[in-house]
Amino acid sequence: SLGLVGSEMCIRDRELHSVKVTAKNAPTLFAGCPIVCEAFDEPDQKALLVETLLATCPDTTIVSGSGMAGMGSANTIRTRKALERLYLCGDGCTDVATEGSLASPRVGVCAGHQANMILRLILGETEP
């Protein structure tokens, strides 16, 4: 629990920014963040953030949601380590464009996977 206490303090010390995240400002906005939880709705925004942080913030690990649209089984949502510093949570294939919409139960399951992976990373566990 000592790791969590230190991380909570770190989170409280962060500044809030009300800005649009761009490739230009993302490295500054997320500088010094050991873990970033990506939760954008739009695929292009997700890609921009993930690609920018992987390229410019070598000490940052990203936990991203991908594939949670529709009313399919929540049991298809999982967490996988895609790259050394990138974890993907979701089913990896469903999309709002094909499924029509997001459903809050599947979004909640995916968010739970993201939160769990982030806690595991804080505790030093790197495998999903």
Where are the model-predicted features located?
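Single conserved hydrophobic/aromatic residue that forms the stacking wall/gate
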Residues: 1-6, 10-11
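A Rossmann-like FAD-binding core segment of flavoenzymes
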Residues: 12, 23, 126
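Hydrophobic/aromatic anchor residues within beta-strands of the central parallel beta-sheet
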Residues: 14-16
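Conserved SAM/SAH-binding loop
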Residues: 18-26
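Glycine-rich phosphate/adenylate-binding loop
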Residues: 29-35, 39-128
